[in-house]
Amino acid sequence: MLIDAGCGGRIVSLKSNRHELLLQDSINPINYGSTLWVSPQDWGWPPPAILDRDRYSVRIENNSLMLSSGVDDLMKCKIEKTIHSVVGDTSFVIEYKIINESDIILKYAPWEVTRVPAGGITFFPEGPAGGKRQSKLNIIKHEGIVWFYFDPLLVNDHQKLFYNGKEGWLAHQTNSLLFIKRYPDISYEQEAPGETEVELYIHKNRTYMELEIQGEYVSLSPKDTIVWKVCWFLRERQNKIETDDERKNVLSYVRRLVNGEK
């Protein structure tokens, strides 16, 4: 894993051997790597530079990399990221903090946005609330799991999926890699206005997609902090996911991994 403190404390590379998962800046010089946004998207576009693109301060403490942004004048908050690896299961734990730097009560939710080259298969358990909006993506729902198989022929515009999840994980399979995010599951009622726990975005030029998860939308008193932990797993896995048996096999593998089973 590589982190660029000079560009919003982004995670800019995640590899297994020579296989890169994340979208690189050579493909899109603005939207690449993985970052944290503040939800809901009241800030419009682009994201506040001081949180998304400006330099973060850095320190190392107890084998963890700790990154801190400045305070954004619009959102009245700052972001801190603490990242460390776990030797036992070769995962990475990312602890995000959003700190209210105003003198009034504000409401936020954390929003992790991870950009990868367009392609592959993305899947996650469907929550009780299901889709919050009509999805523009061609998805398959089978035995409680939402499956998205990328097909460039079906992409003719920006496309997005909004869904309430379950079990607290999202997985993405490429030709050679299986990537899994584990995070605290939230209910429909805990989602930020106009947002959902799981969101997928496909760029209209078919070059990249975003794997997005969000945490609970909460009120913060002045100087209070949201703390949100996400765990990443990356495994080399080339199995196809086309038949029911193949889907069952990969689901069993993912669930064992996120539950800490051998």
Protein language model features and the residues they cover:
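Extended, loop-rich substrate-binding clefts of extracytoplasmic carbohydrate-active enzymes
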Residues: 41-90, 105-108, 119-121, 204-207
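Tryptophan-centric aromatic hotspots in well-structured domains and transmembrane helices
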Residues: 36-38, 111, 232
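Short peripheral tails and domain-boundary helices/loops at the edges of structured domains
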Residues: 246-262
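Hydrophobic beta-strand positions in extracellular immunoglobulin-like domains
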Residues: 97-98, 232
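Acidic-aromatic substrate-binding/catalytic surfaces of carbohydrate-active enzymes
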Residues: 1-53, 251
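Well-ordered beta-strand positions in beta-sheet-rich domains
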Residues: 80-82, 225-229
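A contiguous, surface-exposed recognition patch within enzymatic or periplasmic domains that forms
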Residues: 1, 5-22, 90, 101-109, ...
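Short hydrophobic/aromatic-rich beta-strand segments that constitute the beta-sheet cores
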Residues: 13-14, 66-69, 94
